[in-house]
Amino acid sequence: MKKFTYLFFWIILNVFVTKLVLANEASALDITEDDFIIGDENAPITIIEYASMSCSHCANFHTNTLPDLKKEYIDTGKVRMVFRDYPFNYPALLGSMMMRCIPGDVRYDYMNALYQLQNTWVDRDPKVSKKELYKIMQSGGMTKDEFDSCYSNLDNENLILEGVMAAQKEFNIKSTPSFVINGNIVEGNKNIKEFRQIIDKILSE
């Protein structure tokens, strides 16, 4: 993915470095109540996806690969999928913040809808991204007050940015999507055939 960033975004992000250093040493492999998860918690394989909602390769994964992965491995109890935010710019951060304001039972559908409609709301102009994203969220039933409240929720913003720093520290993630499969990092978008090879190999061991 081409990493276009805004200087102010990374300034905000780096504010949290000190906080992370002083915090309790928790592994980024630990699954917490802040994670968005689908699949059986007792599944033999856990896949953690780090994705940026403005990333075209992430959109490709969610649109073309994830449906088959879900049908073949997640819905059958073989894989637990953990979705984590790794925004590279303001639009991605905004999209991630909106997802944290969506109830868990419908968040999966909203998340994939934003990836499918990525070209309509991701823009270099922050005002354009915010305006177009609101249109999408409004069509799903979110009110203007709810959108504004979510937009100004610093707790959610902090959680996202702290998660980025934790993943960067532990996994040295440089691009999205990146996957951590049972503790092993797999970089780059993979098609369903490649996922089958990785997953089936683990299941056969």
Identify the function of each model-found stretch.
Residues P87-T176, V180-K193, Q197-S204:
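Cysteine-centric redox/oxidoreductase cores and disulfide-bonded domains
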Residues K2-F8, N14-N89, L161-K169, D200-E205:
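Extracytoplasmic thiol/disulfide redox context detector
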